């Protein structure tokens, strides 16, 4: 019987079990170790009463995670990347488009929520349910194809095995 070892010493049978996605992320966390993490932010919209008294929407800290390609890997959770903002002070400026105006407003919400100007903040990230992946065969950009957990890593739908994706992306990160 042939041994099922991959080039990095891992067992390729683990990648065929959807429940093993959790184990792949655990190994990724160990490899990431001291790599820099980015902030996660959560949008808080004031209720009608607070808004009437002048409260404005803000983005507040909601943890930290390693950004690994299209994924945000936290200590216990995994998310799909949403919008990535750089917190900046609110100021009057000319805009060439409504999209630029909305982005500047979102960046100012980060400062109102407590982030230092210049801080990278990930907002609108979507949680990935690894138990749903095991039960239903898909969650977020992850799915199971032919018994292997794969990740959709481009908007056009390109996929690759999650284990190879994590290995490649982590190898490219600064440590």
What spans do the regions from the language model cover?
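Generic alpha-helical propensity signal that fires on short helical segments
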Residues: 50, 89, 96-98, 167-171
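Low-complexity intrinsically disordered segments
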Residues: 2-31, 37, 110-175
